[in-house]
Amino acid sequence: MHIYKSTINNCRFLSLLIFAWALMPQILSAANPERIKIEKGPYLQAVGENEFTVCWRTNMNSVGWIEIAPADGTHFYKKVRPKHFDSTFGRKNIGRFHKVRITGLEPGTAYRYRVMQNSVLLDEDYTRIIYGEGFGSDILSHKPFQVTTLDPAKKSVKFAVGNDFHEKDSLLRKAFAKARDKKYDFVMFNGDMTTRMKNEDYIFDNYLQSASELFASDIPLYMNRGNHENRGSFATRYMDLFPTLTGAPYYTFRQGPVFFLVIDSGEDKPDNDIRNLDIMCHDEFRATQLEWLKGVLDSEEFKKAPVKIVFMHMPPDGTPGSWYGTQELNDKYMPLLNNAGIDLMLCGHYHAFKFVPADTKGYNNKFPIIIHDDAVLLEAEADENTIKIVTYDKNQNPEHRHEFAVSK
């Protein structure tokens, strides 16, 4: 009799355990009533002829994915859309920041996309993963996001540039308020968007979330490091937030007739300067980048492009008043670029507009250079014959205009 009662009690206890196990997701959900949502982003990165990358952050741990559909006029729910997961070599990533690269696309083609995530309530290593609710971008009350891949056959290109905003998010919102209406092919942030790389929130709060809301969910955003992106404890995480087509902070892309060359100018002071905290090694970095640059300039893709434009945050200034970093660029990069048929270089760094015509003493340049002012907008249009530049002041009034004939 005693054995019989003990068996019954054990069975009841086991039943309670099974019941509690089954209720665990509901218990965890009740303990964490916050719903999964897109907290920051999305924003586009590394848009190429056959690919694009979407980045965003959720408010809690989750797995994330992107669903895509051609911009063919059909409803997004017309059919099952392919899912592309934030994953690492076959395993979905669990976290808050998500990054999804989508490849195998057609050049010059518009694609709609939907951002999705499923909350993770419990991750017990090898034992089990308990999921909560899933949700994503609302395609019932809002149109899906849309991106167009790059197209080298396009006859012209229109783009915008901003640099040296240094936490002036309100000025960025003014400068790029009409970015969607102006239908830029892309936007380039050409360095020093913040004074330091403090943490993820600091970057989102000071410019990246505004960029997402104003244009970067649908218009490609390209980034170029300035000297200040090298500073701060989050600096080595730069590539996590801003992936590129090369996997390095220097890269190239082609839109329409223009071959764009993005060069990372590095730090402005010597590596051993006391203010660099004994943490910089940019001499080595610039040497590595220089070898990459030689290969780019020797490529048929570069040589055959009708127009060639360089983005570089620090100008290649070799005048007597220049600093170490700009002198290094002048000494080591300009000899290569001067023989490469460059049509225009766009820089920042000096927080003041300056036009540097070809053959300016101290710059040793065979092509024009525009040093763009801080925290204002530059717009450019180019075809195979002409490059047109307009810069604006902080009240959004046109300030400088330049037109350049493309070298043949």
Where are these regions (language model features)?
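Bacterial N-terminal signal peptides that target proteins for export
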Residues: 3-15
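Bacterial N-terminal signal peptides
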Residues: 15-26
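Acidic, histidine-bearing metal-coordination/catalytic regions of metal-dependent phosphoesterases
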Residues: 28-160, 180-181, 383-408
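Extended active-site neighborhood of metal-dependent phosphoesterases/phosphodiesterases
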Residues: 115-146, 202-298, 332-338, 354-385, ...
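Conserved, compact domain cores that house catalytic/ligand-binding motifs in diverse enzymes
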Residues: 155-230
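Loop/turn elements at helix/coil->beta-strand transitions in domains of secreted/extracellular proteins
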Residues: 155-157, 182-187, 217-221, 255-259, ...
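Active-site neighborhood of phospho(di)ester-bond hydrolases with catalytic His/Asp-centered motifs
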Residues: 160-163, 186-192, 220-227, 309-313, ...
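Active-site-proximal segments of metal-dependent phosphoesterases and phosphodiesterases across multiple
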Residues: 276-278, 282, 300-344
